[in-house]
């Protein structure tokens, strides 16, 4: 155990030799990434060359799951169920902690689940069936591929029939066939009814209600043939009882542009006018009211905004009051799907809601190994083509650190009672980080943004109150800014000249980060309404507990949202403030600034970047033989008038 932690710490420091001092039964993150970038995982190869490494990765995942959950294992030895799913598929039953074990518990019987999996596996592309991977408040968050089209379905059915000696092993056991099943088997859609019927049974057994489809197509068209379908265009409306959400998201080939732009996702917008893009965004109205997002503008969002808003939607679904589960899928389920499954897992973990005992390096290992490697992401192929969706996933953590992505159900302060004395520094100090806003106005060194909830009477608009120091030129600034967070806190502190720190760069970084934040910044009003009062000093006779006198504050100016100075207030040197500024970083609530969530996600991202740079690295694009062949075939298809798209199936 200590060796694993030491290896994780070494990986987070960027050491390529992180495996040197760890016991042979465990692999560090660096070795995991090396194996991942060297070969694609296949369940049937687990006992062959490199099998010992894969076995250690699998055992490490089981050990990490076992820290917080009681689980069963569905065997997939040699890929009998699916060739690119884990050989040990983990089914989480309940949290093992004393506090939670009696709160939420799965009602699923593993034997019946296993039977439904075997029966339904051909319903989805590449046999990638609906698989539960996250347990949150008793709800199963699942992943899969999209529905198989008739070509794949009949092809696999014939293959299985031929190689099983004439017996269709998926339907060999028919002792529990109901009258409803018999009725479904009539007519020309016999096979579709059968396999999709079992797929629906599996979804219902896992209590899945919401199905989120990330495909930009209604049906995947390849060389002029429909190779996959999706629930939203099922002609028989078999999935009508589920809540279907079409949230089109660019495929892995789009992330070639992300790499070519120096890994800058800000400003990178998908071309929605391509001929194969025919799946519009479609979300039931009752699911969007609480999110305050203008979904009609989705085609104008850049990659950061789109990913942020989709993640907010998924978090709102899993955090709803009902007990309904969620399915996320794309086409093959090994690029876009693990992206959002990983972001969900890491976001909920950062809130302390799942995997509560895992450290940042441990949750990172589990996410990379289980959500990406063991579920068949083709990192080798993606790296050769420059399609770095895997790197994007973990680098993107800097954009979801703020509390607006938190699933914790805390009561927001929607309004404050009017008082004659205005706002005191204690009021600012007691505001949650979520309510402090961001540095969005030019020239501001500190801004306080009071957020309003839609429809809340008496609440504040998005109006900034900025406190700008007006002291002597010798004043220096202590700045706390985190470019990884959409919201930053900047506080000016006078210091001796020798303590002066470069400030312009930090301020620019903070503003750059703020500008990339979802569509949050679009909701700021700069109308110059009546400003709030400057925080007033408390009486010396009534200091706050833990406060101290300070003599280095000088005067402060009040600036409205439009930037005009309204009035001046002076904080006298004998004023008692609700916090003090020692030479080292204080533990006061205003400068404790980093929330647990932000700290955790930053540590995960830092550990990933260190390990990735020392193993995989940010590579130049190399030509892919398979890509060249696919390109020639695509050109041929276009030449004969067939409708087709890129050869990369996601």
UniProtKB/Swiss-Prot annotation:
Q: Mainly resides where? A: cytoplasm
Q: Which reaction does it catalyse?
A: a 1,2-diacyl-sn-glycero-3-phospho-(1D-myo-inositol-3,5-bisphosphate) + H2O = a 1,2-diacyl-sn-glycero-3-phospho-(1D-myo-inositol-5-phosphate) + phosphate; a 1,2-diacyl-sn-glycero-3-phospho-(1D-myo-inositol-3-phosphate) + H2O = a 1,2-diacyl-sn-glycero-3-phospho-(1D-myo-inositol) + phosphate
Tissues showing expression:
Expressed in various tissues, including heart, skeletal muscle, placenta, liver, lung, kidney and pancreas.
List glycan-bearing residues.
226, 519
Q: Which CDD domains match?
A: PH-GRAM_MTMR14
Task: Name any one GO molecular function.
Answer: phosphatidylinositol-3,5-bisphosphate 3-phosphatase activity
Modified positions (Phosphoserine) in chain numbering: 518, 530, 580, 624
> What keywords appear on the UniProt entry?
Acetylation, Cytoplasm, Disease variant, Glycoprotein, Hydrolase, Methylation, Phosphoprotein
Tell me one GO biological process term: phosphatidylinositol biosynthetic process
Localization per record: Cytoplasm
Q: Which residues carry this modification: N6-acetyllysine?
A: 194
Q: What is its EC number?
A: 3.1.3.95
Q: Name the residues that bind a 1,2-diacyl-sn-glycero-3-phospho-(1D-myo-inositol-3,5-bisphosphate).
A: 333-336, 382
Region Disordered, as annotated, extends over 1-27, 476-546
The record's similarity note reads:
Belongs to the protein-tyrosine phosphatase family. Non-receptor class myotubularin subfamily.
Q: What is this protein called?
A: Phosphatidylinositol-3,5-bisphosphate 3-phosphatase MTMR14
């Amino acid at each position: 155990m200590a060796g694993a932690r030491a290896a994780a710490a070494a990986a987070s420091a960027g050491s390529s030799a992180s495996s040197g001092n760890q016991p042979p039964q465990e692999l560090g993150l660096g070795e995991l990434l090396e194996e991942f970038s060297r070969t694609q995982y296949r369940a049937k190869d687990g006992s062959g060359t490199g099998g010992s490494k894969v076995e250690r990765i699998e055992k490490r995942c089981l050990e990490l799951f076992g820290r917080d959950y009681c689980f069963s294992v569905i065997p997939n030895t040699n890929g009998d169920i699916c060739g690119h799913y884990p050989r040990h598929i983990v089914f989480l039953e309940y949290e093992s902690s004393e506090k939670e074990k009696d709160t939420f518990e799965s009602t699923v019987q593993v034997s019946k689940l296993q039977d439904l999996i075997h029966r339904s596996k051909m319903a989805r592309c590449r046999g990638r069936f609906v698989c539960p991977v996250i347990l949150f408040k008793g709800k199963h968050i699942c992943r899969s591929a999209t529905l198989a089209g008739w070509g794949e379905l009949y092809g696999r059915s014939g293959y299985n029939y031929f190689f099983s000696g004439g017996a269709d092993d998926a339907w060999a056991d028919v002792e529990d066939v109901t009258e409803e099943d018999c009725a479904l088997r009539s007519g020309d859609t016999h096979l579709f009814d059968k396999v999709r019927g079992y797929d629906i049974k599996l979804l219902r057994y896992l209590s899945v209600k919401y199905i989120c489809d990330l495909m930009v197509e209604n049906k995947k068209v390849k060389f002029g043939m429909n190779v996959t379908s999706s629930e939203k265009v099922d002609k028989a409306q078999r999935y009508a009882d589920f809540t279907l959400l079409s949230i089109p998201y660019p495929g892995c080939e789009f992330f070639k542009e992300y790499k070519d732009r120096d890994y800058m996702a800000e400003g990178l917008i998908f071309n929605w006018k391509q001929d194969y893009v025919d799946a519009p965004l479609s979300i039931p109205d009752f699911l969007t009211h609480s999110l305050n997002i203008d979904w009609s503008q989705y085609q104008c969002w850049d990659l950061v905004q789109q990913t942020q808003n989709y993640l907010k939607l998924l978090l709102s679904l899993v955090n709803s009051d009902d007990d309904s589960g969620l399915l996320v899928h794309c086409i093959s389920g090994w690029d876009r799907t693990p992206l959002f499954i990983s972001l969900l897992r890491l976001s909920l973990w950062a809130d302390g809601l799942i995997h509560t005992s895992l450290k940042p390096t441990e949750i990172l290992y589990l996410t990379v190994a289980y959500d990406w490697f063991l579920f068949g992401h083709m990192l080798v192929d993606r790296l050769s083509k420059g399609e770095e969706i895997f790197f994007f996933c973990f680098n993107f953590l800097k954009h979801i650190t703020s509390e607006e992505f938190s699933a914790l159900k805390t009561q927001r302060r929607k309004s404050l009672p009017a008082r004659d004395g205005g706002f005191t520094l204690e009021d600012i100090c007691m505001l949650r980080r979520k309510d402090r806003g961001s540095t969005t106005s030019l020239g501001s060194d500190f801004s306080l943004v009071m957020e309003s909830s839609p429809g809340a009477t008496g609440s504040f608009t998005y109006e900034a109150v900025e406190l700008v120091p007006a002291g002597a030129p010798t004043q220096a600034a202590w700045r706390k800014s985190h470019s990884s967070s959409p919201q930053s806190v900047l506080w000016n502190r006078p210091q001796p000249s020798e303590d002066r720190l470069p400030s312009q760069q930090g301020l620019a970084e903070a503003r750059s980060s703020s500008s990339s934040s979802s569509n949050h910044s679009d909701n700021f009003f700069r109308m110059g309404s009546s400003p709030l009062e400057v925080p007033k000093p408390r009486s010396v006779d009534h200091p706050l507990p833990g406060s101290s006198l300070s003599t280095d504050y000088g005067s402060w100016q009040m600036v409205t949202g439009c930037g005009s100075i309204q009035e001046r207030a002076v904080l006298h040197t004998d004023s008692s403030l609700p916090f003090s500024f020692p030479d080292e970083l204080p533990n006061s609530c205003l400068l404790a600034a980093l929330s647990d969530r932000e700290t955790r996600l930053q540590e995960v991202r830092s550990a990933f970047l260190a390990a990735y740079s020392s193993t995989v690295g940010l590579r130049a694009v190399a030509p892919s033989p398979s890509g060249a062949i696919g390109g020639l075939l695509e050109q041929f298809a276009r030449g004969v008038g067939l409708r087709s798209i890129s050869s990369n199936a996601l």
